[in-house]
Amino acid sequence: MALGSTAALAHDSHNEHAKVKPEIPTSLQYNFEYRMAKEKARDAFRHPKQTLKFFGVKPTDTVVEIWPGGGWYTQILAPALEGNGQYVAAHWPKDSSVGFFTKYRAKFDVKFTDHPERYGDISVTSFEPPKNTTLAPSESADVVLTFRNVHNWMSKNYEQTVFDSAFKALKPGGVLGVVEHRAKPGTKRLAMIESGYVTEDYVKQLAQNAGFEFAGASEINANPKDIKNYPAGVWTLPPTLRLKEQNKAKYLNIGESDRMTLKFVKPSK
């Protein structure tokens, strides 16, 4: 009887142990194994850990990144969300009429979606207004992020559409995080498009028009060395260095652009 009781106790203990689920971390856990040295070097200007902390990204979140390009942030976010959350890349369509878009979308797929063993189950949607305006299913995202894209949307005159799409994709209480090259206050629209620098006031207005509430700003990605007046706009600075060897040392010394880091919230119902 005692032996049977001991066996039963051991069996119950085993069942209880089997029911215990792995503890979900309360903050993002980073795996930089697959990042190249040149990508890590940009952390000094892009501050990914601090930026994502400011936006409040959690490991259980569904996070949509608009136009991730070559996937600099994908390498950081996708592994950190794997298993508990979901990374969604709202990328350029494979059939876009813009050659640059199709080229880099193909590169993204080869690097990321073809390697779930590294980056997990990445979800990719096609986003290119005015044809493709759905970032993700309505009210499915906890966080929508965009890094240095607003000036691109302005050049096509669909920046408001993008902010509206972000609002629709987010759950009530969800966060929109925007990082963008920061123009001097009062800069005119055409100058913003030509230079790549956008005013904070204009970004705030776009968000407000979409229905967002402003939730805070951070100077994490500020660069006081950036004078914002260059022959080839913001692309004069690294990492683009559009002027190539011309005054290269000067521009490398300035570093990457001065950037706003703004947080907006979709009001709860």
Language-model regions: role of each:
Residues 24-59:
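Class I SAM-dependent methyltransferase Rossmann-like catalytic core
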Residues 59-69:
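Conserved class I S-adenosyl-L-methionine
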Residues 78-79, 159-172:
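A short glycine-rich, Lys/Arg-flanked "PGG" loop and its adjoining helix->strand segment in the class I
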Residues 88-90, 173-181:
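Conserved beta-strand signature within the Rossmann-like core of class I S-adenosyl-L-methionine
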Residues 101-133:
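S-adenosyl-L-methionine
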Residues 129-130, 152-165:
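A short, conserved alpha-helix within the catalytic core of class I
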Residues 133-144:
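A short acidic, Gly/Pro-enriched loop at the edge of an enzyme's catalytic core
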Residues 227-269:
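Core SAM-dependent methyltransferase catalytic element
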